[in-house]
């Protein structure tokens, strides 16, 4: 009997932490959240395991997580192993037919499989698919303009259409969809590599998601990089649009994705530091958000 009060006392802080999450649990219950998995979190074993725990936690907390992933580091390593030299133009990987075979193999056969495996350590939850499956992502050949001229960068696609049917069926069945950023073209039947940040944003908008969350290797969007490491914690779509021309090239597709999402019905888009374990939970279930949140212009002050 003498241990009773002590036990009660030591358990109280845990109860307090759980109760603090209640307003967020209420707010996000039943809502869809699209999470773009990328950066250092993809190659660090502890971060990968923590990411899987976070996604499963969201699922069991009543949210509907959808994971979208790329595989930059793994693709580069596999291309090196196959003796295929990676070339970049306008920040986009030039994807030859040979390279596309490797990209597809790595994304659908390695990165996706590993992620599905990590999630399924917690139960029969995750199902992997690519944008090719059930016409989830349709694309056309992307030809960027450099110095006024269209440049051929091979099998790189621009998203033209999203079909959410397969993902919605999986969510309705209580599963966690894990989507590889590969798409097929209806024009030429070819398979294309699409930017995973762009794919995540397009899926978030098409699904009517509450939140788009993009994991990065930085703390968020910096106020005045490189002169300052002050992170902008919140900004509107219009404010972000003004900043886009000044951003480092690696951040452009991420922030353009956030802009597209909030301008197409997504309540908030967040760029968070994927190097911090459980950063997803910190961002969703506390008021101490650790990244940059983008909100629609008309809802400034209302979005949370």
Swiss-Prot record:
Pathway: Amino-acid biosynthesis; L-arginine biosynthesis; N(2)-acetyl-L-ornithine from L-glutamate: step 2/4. Its EC number is 2.7.2.8. GO terms for cellular component: cytoplasm. It is an enzyme of class 2 (transferase). It is found in: Cytoplasm. Substrate binds at residues 71-72, 93, 193. InterPro entries: AceGlu_kinase-like_sf, AcgluKinase_fam, ArgB, Asp/Glu/Uridylate_kinase, Glu/AcGlu_kinase, NAGK-C. GO terms for molecular function: acetylglutamate kinase activity; ATP binding. The record marks 36, 254 as: Transition state stabilizer. One of its GO terms (biological process) is arginine biosynthetic process via ornithine. Keywords: Amino-acid biosynthesis, Arginine biosynthesis, ATP-binding, Cytoplasm, Kinase, Nucleotide-binding, Transferase. It catalyses: N-acetyl-L-glutamate + ATP = N-acetyl-L-glutamyl 5-phosphate + ADP. Catalyzes the ATP-dependent phosphorylation of N-acetyl-L-glutamate. Belongs to the acetylglutamate kinase family. ArgB subfamily. This is Acetylglutamate kinase.
């Amino acid at each position: 009997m003498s241990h009773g009060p002590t036990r009660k006392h030591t358990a109280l802080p845990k109860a307090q932490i759980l109760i603090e999450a209640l307003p967020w649990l209420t707010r996000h219950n039943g809502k869809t959240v699209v999470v773009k998995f990328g950066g250092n979190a993809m190659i660090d074993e502890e971060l990968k395991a923590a990411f899987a725990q976070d996604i499963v936690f969201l699922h069991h907390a009543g949210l509907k997580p959808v994971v979208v992933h790329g595989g930059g580091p793994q693709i580069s390593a596999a291309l090196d192993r196959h003796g295929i030299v990676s070339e970049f133009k306008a920040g986009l990987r030039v994807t030859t037919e040979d390279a596309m075979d490797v990209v597809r193999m790595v994304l659908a056969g390695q990165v996706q499989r590993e992620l599905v495996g990590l999630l399924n350590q917690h139960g029969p939850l995750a199902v992997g698919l690519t944008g090719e499956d059930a016409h989830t992502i349709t694309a056309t050949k992307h030809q960027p303009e450099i110095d006024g001229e269209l440049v051929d960068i091979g099998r790189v696609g621009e998203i033209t259409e999203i079909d959410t049917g397969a993902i919605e069926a999986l969510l309705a069945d209580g599963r966690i969809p894990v989507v590889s950023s590969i798409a097929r073209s209806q024009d030429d039947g070819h398979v294309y590599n699409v930017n995973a940040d762009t794919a995540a944003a397009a899926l978030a908008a098409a699904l009517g998601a509450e939140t788009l969350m993009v994991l990065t290797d930085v703390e968020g969007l910096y106020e005045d990089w490189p002169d300052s490491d002050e992170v902008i914690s919140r900004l509107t779509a219009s404010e972000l649009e003004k900043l886009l021309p000044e951003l480092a090239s690696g951040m452009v597709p991420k922030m353009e994705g956030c802009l597209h999402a909030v301008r197409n019905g997504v309540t908030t888009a967040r760029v968070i530091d994927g190097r911090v374990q459980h950063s997803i939970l910190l961002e969703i279930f506390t008021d101490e958000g650790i990244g940059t949140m983008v909100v629609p212009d008309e809802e400034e002050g209302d979005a949370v």
